[in-house]
Amino acid sequence: ILIVCSFAVGFLKGFLMLWFIRYAQKIFSPKNVRSEFYSYFYPLVYGGGQASMLVTALLAYHYNWKYMYYFMMVLILISILFVIICFRHNRPIKVVAWSDLHIREMFVISAGLLMLMYVINYGKVLDWMASGKICAYIIIAPMLIALFIWYQSRSENPYVSLAPLFQPKAIIGYFYMMLVMFFSTSTTLLTNYLTVILKVDTTHTYSLYTYLLPGYVVGAFICFWWFRWQRWRFRFLIAGGMSCFVIFFAILYFGISPDSTYEMLYLPIFFRGLGMLTLIIAFALFAVEDLNPKYLLSNAFFLIIFRSVLAPILATSFYSNALYRLQQKYMYFLSETITTADPLSATRYNQSLNNAITQGHPYNEAAQLATNSLYNTLQQQSLLLALKEILGYLLVISVVIAVVSRFIPFHKTIRVTFKRTGDDMV
């Protein structure tokens, strides 16, 4: 039921986003300059998402978690009421043929993507090939996606044109935006650090992520004036955006420890927001620079799939699986040295044992509490070591990409020459 409802919400969200873009263009960019519009649009989209998560966390913290859903239901009912009262019903000029709705193509690509996402998300949990569902979806998902591509390549009136996939700039843009979302999703590692090591609750975790908002604002401001002036090479902007991720990973790699503070994370979160939005806006413009305006909706289709669907779920699955594997590796490594012959381990164990006995626990129960205390310490240490290793690799990769991007000849400058912004949802 949840999957079906989420699918319906996403389906309707596409129409709402298209409607919002059509009217927001007139407000944010009366002259229909794409770079100016994106500098307003993307901060609103990503900033609104962060703000909504904070509001729901505050409601769940201060009230019963059910009230959060009651609040959302009330807002939805109010929105429906406004639509009924204020929106004018525009009758279609002509009847739309059933074949023009492309129901078959929508079903095929939706089913294929849902199965692919299920495999990526639950493959490790269900032990991959030991699960019948995973085996079936691994076979069916690529077949459905290939069938969808075959339909579009042979259709005279395709549901989605494949033209953007043959544009080099569009492919480079999709690739870089997937990298950006892969790096940005690394905040899942930070969430583990906050909850396990610093013992921070959900509300304060989401409050920390509000420091992304100043980064979004600064990134949008930089892009607005960078593309208006167009005095510097495009690769300098990309290298600068990647350097923000270098700073983000460097501060986390050298800064996280059991003695670190919550406030220490404000600055890296800011740089993550700055780098993310700068690169998202830059490559959203770069991907459509040489694209025929009639393919803008097709570009939006592929951009949303690569940037907002596949990249986050791939990154989340990778980080969670890598963190679990490395944590188990370091847990085994550290536990080998935990014996009574080790002075530090023996001291910690005896201290916990004596404290439990002093509190009135029987010896057997006190011994169990002391063992659990030592186990929790090992868990924290293994998590820290696993985080350090992953963040170290991410730091090196981001440095390499930042340096390479500095010398990639994207072009001398990016010239935004479109007369109209277009009805796309990127």
Predicted regions and their residues:
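Small-residue (Gly/Pro/Ala) motifs that create kinks and tight helix-helix packing interfaces
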Residues: 48-60, 64, 120, 223, ...
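12-transmembrane solute porter fold
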Residues: 159-328
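Helix-loop-helix hairpins in multi-pass membrane proteins, especially solute transporters
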Residues: 1-105
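Hydrophobic transmembrane-helix bundles of small-molecule transporters
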Residues: 62-180, 187
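Cytoplasmic loop-to-transmembrane helix junctions
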Residues: 32-40, 292-302, 386
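Hydrophobic transmembrane architecture of multi-pass small-molecule transporters
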Residues: 311-410, 416-426
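A generic transmembrane-helix signature of 12-TM secondary carrier transporters
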Residues: 5-6, 73, 79-80, 242, ...
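Alpha-helical transmembrane segments of multi-pass secondary-active solute transporters
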Residues: 37, 67-72, 133-137, 205, ...
